[in-house]
């Protein structure tokens, strides 16, 4: 699978450069956009993104993991970061989040609340109305931090 191949190539590069690979997203049809999200304990600057982009581009030119034309984007995950895996979810317990499920849960697919806890591969949200709802992480289409600025 393309995404697995990209992780295998990109993760060692980011680690060697001192960054955490937060996630990779592949979007579009025809001309793909490859989005690489990096993090660092001291934050991520535009210069950091340029360094990673240059190194990844050089390796992609050699390894050629994508046969079609593509656009490469490197950025920080940002404040409203997407949560790519259960380990990231565990680290974000207590944060406000938004979730979109692949199939309806309690007749809805969009949820907003506090990430209350993680149990195995399940994430439990406390919704704004006080209810708790549980999702298998693999059933989430989108899952991201939703900063509260109030």
Curated annotation (Swiss-Prot):
The cross-references to SUPFAM superfamilies, in alphabetical order and at most eight, read: YhbC-like, C-terminal domain (SSF74942), YhbC-like, N-terminal domain (SSF75420)
Alphabetically list the UniProt keywords: Cytoplasm, Ribosome biogenesis
Q: Which GO terms describe its cellular component?
A: cytosol
Q: Where in the cell is the protein located?
A: Cytoplasm
Under the heading Pfam families, the entry gives: DUF150_C (PF17384), RimP_N (PF02576)
GO BP annotations, alphabetical order: ribosomal small subunit assembly; translation
Tell me the protein family, please. Belongs to the RimP family.
Q: State its role.
A: Required for maturation of 30S ribosomal subunits.
This protein is called: Ribosome maturation factor RimP
